[in-house]
Amino acid sequence: MHLSEITHPNQLHGLSIRQLQQIARQIRDKHLQTVAEFGGHLGPGLGVVELTLGLYQTLDLDRDKVIWDVGHQAYPHKLITGRYSDFHTLRQKDGIAGYLKRGENKFDHFGAGHASTSISAALGMALARDMNGEKFKAVAVIGDGALTGGMALEAINHAGHLPKTNLLVVLNDNEMSISPNVGAIPRYLNKMRLSPPVQFIKDNFEEQFKHIPFVGESLSPELGRIKEGMKRLAVPKVGAVFEELGFTYMGPVDGHNLEELIATFQQAHQIAGPVLVHVATIKGKGYELAEKDQVGYHAQTPFNLTTGKAIPSNKPKPPAYAKVFSHTLVKLAEQNPKIIGITAAMATGTGLDKLQAKLPNQYIDVGIAEQHAVTLAAGLATEGMRPVAAIYSTFLQRAYDQIIHDVCIQNLPVFFCLDRAGIVGSDGPTHQGMYDIAYLRCIPNIVMMAPKDEAEMQRMVVTGIEHTTGPIAMRFPRGNGYGVPLMEEGWEPLEIGKGEILRNGDDVLIIGYGTMVYPSMQAAEILSEHGIEATVINARFVKPLDTELIVPLAQKIGRVVTLEEGCVMGGFGSAVAEALLDADVVVPVKRIGIPDVLVEHATPDESKAELGLTSRQIAERVLQAYFQKQPSPVS
């Protein structure tokens, strides 16, 4: 059987180990070819090929439900659930998603994109099953990185107190999240993997057993069960933490040995109550370069399969915002030992790996634990440190109560640096940084700013460090800057709550925030071609808003347009409209941003065009709204 013939996971039933191994090779080939051509997550999926096949051969997927944590390791799952022929559309506009979505396929039982949610969801399904008198298996597959998240531990704590609720948790232990794991839980798991008795049994038992005359080969299918029993006798403390929490623990199991996996899962299905199967895998398995560099090959842009190197762009690009941020922060931290960079398992993505390499004592990685990261930063701030919490906009949502309760209510000087703010592209709706303006600006005491380009970002990093009277946040986008000149030192902080006028005109006032400032200027130039002159403001701050600048100009000009790369509801445009109403200035305000929709996966440019956020579309919308002009001249 060829992988392309599999349209239903139950077709794996009855396949021999040899046939499953052939399917595994085909999955890896398709996975590698697709990601090399189009980009995507590489290492996570390569590491769970045998785990997926072994687990699915023991389940009835017409009935049983498997919940994949995060979802970026579920490419093998997609390939055996009827999406082989569409796999070349992965993460592309109108193609299949890079994560799991309930609406995409009947075997995607729970959507995700963020970590640590699978056990809670699977437990909810298991409880509903029992309440409804149904019969199906509920399985959560979670990585050891995601297991460091508090939500996963909360779910384990709950499930362990439900001895009559059948639930299977498969722990995919590859010793990594995106970067190497940190904390006591990964260290405990690693000790179990490396326990000498476990290693001895793993390395020697099977080979010695097969050499027993007459019975060795005939009992080969039972080796998984026998090996599991031997490990539990030899190492009674293996899995003790999970056993104490109410789970039956099995493992560690070789995550690339199909015989052992199938035998273990079959045994696990016979056990009542919550069961945890600990599977040891290798991230990037089957692609040597990814096995050797598990951080670098977690996710890839298009690359050469032979060399592993990214396919170069046709033209040189300016530095990425994250790179400018990290470079500036390191420079400042070298001069100020009180600056402490904090990441929640995203050191490479946020650029804090540069701080770790240069000043390791001024760097903290808390693992996938955004709530802890924020309150840890608050604690550091109480003692005079300058904590810089660099967290993706979409992930900071997970710590909203801590932002309010632990930072803002106490007015502590924590500097939040929100990477990936705005439209992020092919990761889709779970990762779009659309909501931070709305969810932060409503909180008392916090200051919020966004740079128009990478040079202004450098000044905002200084502003955030020097602002010691309360919390402050800076949002910045994924991707590259504009190529404006940068300084190596001597950056001046900005005055809090002050914007700037970039262009003068009498016909319409355009106020841009962050990434929408340059498109504002470009739209103004297009409007000028039609005899309409715009004043353009770079707001810089949404809170406090520069009302001294904005209100008089709005009253004078009489037509206002706001631009933001965030949700319109409660966002920057709403802040401007509220300020004008509070000042009794009644003028029309056209708010342009992301409407009340989920932004699906596509390139950022494709998404912006679909949302009407290109400079030409902005000019068109202004013409239609205020000057009764048809769109054709600027379409």
From Swiss-Prot:
Binds 1 Mg(2+) ion per subunit. Binds 1 thiamine pyrophosphate per subunit. Its cofactor is Mg(2+); thiamine diphosphate. InterPro entries: Dxylulose-5-P_synthase, THDP-binding, Transketo_C/PFOR_II, Transketolase-like_Pyr-bd, Transketolase_BS, Transketolase_C, Transketolase_CS. GO terms for molecular function: 1-deoxy-D-xylulose-5-phosphate synthase activity; magnesium ion binding; thiamine pyrophosphate binding. GO terms for cellular component: cytosol. One of its GO terms (biological process) is thiamine biosynthetic process. Mg(2+) binds at residues 144, 174. Thiamine diphosphate binds at residues 72, 113-115, 145-146, 174, 287, 370. PROSITE patterns: TRANSKETOLASE_1, TRANSKETOLASE_2. It holds the Pfam family DXP_synthase_N. Keywords: Isoprene biosynthesis, Magnesium, Metal-binding, Thiamine biosynthesis, Thiamine pyrophosphate, Transferase. Its EC number is 2.2.1.7. Pathway: Metabolic intermediate biosynthesis; 1-deoxy-D-xylulose 5-phosphate biosynthesis; 1-deoxy-D-xylulose 5-phosphate from D-glyceraldehyde 3-phosphate and pyruvate: step 1/1. It comes from the Bacteria. It catalyses: D-glyceraldehyde 3-phosphate + pyruvate + H(+) = 1-deoxy-D-xylulose 5-phosphate + CO2. The keyword Metal-binding applies. Disulfide bonds: none annotated. Catalyzes the acyloin condensation reaction between C atoms 2 and 3 of pyruvate and glyceraldehyde 3-phosphate to yield 1-deoxy-D-xylulose-5-phosphate (DXP). PANTHER family: 1-D-DEOXYXYLULOSE 5-PHOSPHATE SYNTHASE-RELATED, 1-DEOXY-D-XYLULOSE-5-PHOSPHATE SYNTHASE, CHLOROPLASTIC. Belongs to the transketolase family. DXPS subfamily. HAMAP family: DXP_synth. Homodimer. This is 1-deoxy-D-xylulose-5-phosphate synthase. It comes from Nostoc sp. (strain PCC 7120 / SAG 25.82 / UTEX 2576). The lineage of its organism: Bacteria, Bacillati, Cyanobacteriota, Cyanophyceae, Nostocales.
